[in-house]
Every structure is written in structure tokens, then in C-alpha cells.
Amino acid sequence: TPAIVTQAGARRFPRYALLLLCGIYVFSGFIGRDGWKSADMVALGIMSELVQGSAHWLQPSLMGMPANEPALLPYWLGAWGMQIAPAWSAVDFVARIPFMLLLWFAMMATWYGTYYLARHPQAQPVAFAFGGEAQPKDYARAIADGGVLAFIACLGLAQLSHETTPALAQLGFSALLYY
């Protein structure tokens, strides 16, 4: 059934508040913590072995054992981060930076994908007989803001968003497909 939304119901969510919430969510999970899950530690170990030259870049492994995940790009991103890191920086933190960017990218792609989907004429709310319905742009922004908030809520339940594992890269690239 079509939505019945007034212009007042589609008022803008403060952009700074949404960006601040997304930034806090991204940074709080990556900054000031050590790897605490075995999958996180294995991924960091594989990246470290790639940097040290102990493993082949096309067949990442940890102590001779092949990686559990058949993904290459996430390990490469972390290893490249480790390679370009200054000597004074913590290697595990630098390996997390590409994953922080992937999570931010997933949030942006979700917002824009939902925004463009909600701007479609078939997704617009019912037009009122005497006006007052939500404008397409405002309605799409409200739906996209809600979509990102729901996305963050679901990520909080899944607990994969703050790991340095291929699952986060899969999430980021899936969000790109959605966009």
C-alpha cells in the first residue's frame, strides 16, 4: 500500500547528527581496541605474513595454513596499509584503516542507494487532494536517513562491522551493488 506522508512528517534529520552518529559508530569500534576475536586475529596474522613475505599474495596463508576465507582483496588492503604505515604507528591499527573506510563506504552507499530508490516515482507517497504531501526530495532524504539508522542497528546485532575480516569487505561491496 502507498505511504501517506505529510511534508511535516518528512522533515530533515540534521545532517551533522547523522554524520556524527556514523562517525562515532565507525571510530569507536576500531580505535583503542585490540583484536579480540579469533577471525580478527587470523586476518591480521595473514596480512602480517603477506607484508613479511612469508605468504604468497595470491594464496594468503598463516603459518602455512591457507586462509579460511577465499577472499584476496581484504587481505591485500590490510597488508598495503601495513606496508605504507610509518614506523612509529601500531601495525594492527594501520591494518584497520581500510576496513574503517569500507564501513564508512557501506554506510554512504546504503544512504545513497535508499535515497535514489525512494526518489523513484513509484515509491512516492500518496498525493493529497488539497496538497501538503511530502516533496519527493524530502521524502527520499527521510527514508534514506531511516535506512542508514536501520543499517547501523542491524550491524550492531551482526557484530561483523568492527572486525578486520573479509566479511566487512563483502558488506561494503554488497552495499555498492545496492547503490
Language-model-detected regions and their locations in the chain:
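Extracytosolic helix-loop segments that constitute the early lumenal/periplasmic catalytic or substrate-binding loops
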Residues: 25, 43-69, 73-76, 80-83
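Start-transfer (signal-anchor) and selected internal transmembrane alpha helices
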Residues: 1-27, 140
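Helix-to-loop transition at the C-terminal end of transmembrane segments
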Residues: 24-43
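Membrane-embedded alpha-helical segments in integral membrane proteins
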Residues: 82-83, 150-159
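Specific aromatic-rich, kink-prone transmembrane helix
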Residues: 156, 169-179
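Loop-to-helix entry region of an early transmembrane alpha helix in multi-pass inner-membrane enzymes
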Residues: 72, 76, 85-113, 137-145, ...
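Transmembrane-helix motifs of polytopic, lipid-linked glycan transferases
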Residues: 97-136, 148-153, 176
